[in-house]
Amino acid sequence: VVPSEERIGSVVLLLADGSVDGAPSFEARTVLNGVARVSDVSAADLDGDGDLDLAVAMFGLYKTGGALWLERRPDGRYKRHVIVQRNGVSHVPVADFDGDGRTDVLVLISQEHEELLLLVGRGRGRFEPYPLFAGPHPMFGLSGCEVCDLDGDGDLDVLFANGDALDQDPHPKPWHGAHWLENRTEPGGRPQFTHHELVRFPGAYSAVPGDLDGDGDLDVVVTSMLNRWDQPDRQSLIWLENAGVGAFVPHPVDTAPASLVCAEVDDLDGDGRAAVLAGGLHLMPPVHALGRVPAWFQRAPSGPR
């Protein structure tokens, strides 16, 4: 968990090779080793040759880190290509953001950089960088991003959170929250994104999309990692109702468990309604309201409670 300059990062493929006693069995194959701490891996055809390559994020600490892609060769080996040489890279989701049929790479760079960078695929493994968003100061706290069509207009937007404060002053900040980068790029054109702040929410560590009220559009769940032990009424989970035309209305969900760092939205019990599954990470003492993998199920059609 603790960031480090050590080159202890690796990428391991788990290849299905049958089953043992009825359970799936996998062969572990290391395709990258001896790099800065790996924080994310995404698979896609990045060079247009028909097979799956890998985009890799390496967080490192202050001097190490970056992003690269691993080109799958015909012999099954992987060739590395460096695409970002900066510390603090935490996420590398892949998608076609400009509608040209080629895969692009979104790079979230935290630490002192606080930037979202889009690497637009130009074919044959070539990428052109376009800055999409830059935080106003080095303590902005970028902590996670998701790719989704939040406004339902047929292209892919970016949903992101800034609630990381695991630095010299590990407390919730008033500028933490959830944000939406609205994709306004013309097909095949230069990337154009408009920034919208959705909500201020201290400690907002992740923001994930899902249709929570069953009305057919995407709402947003936001978790907080930094609940204060001396403020037990502070929310650790909220949801933002999509009210249309770019408006989102915040609703409280729960104050406990505290210190939630991730969430997923899905129908967990098969009742046709979305539920929320979250993950807790209790790092900052005094820890309270513990809960590693809590879930919230709907009992009414108006969102999780």
Q: Residue locations for each model-derived region?
A:
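Beta-propeller-forming repeat regions
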Residues: 1-305
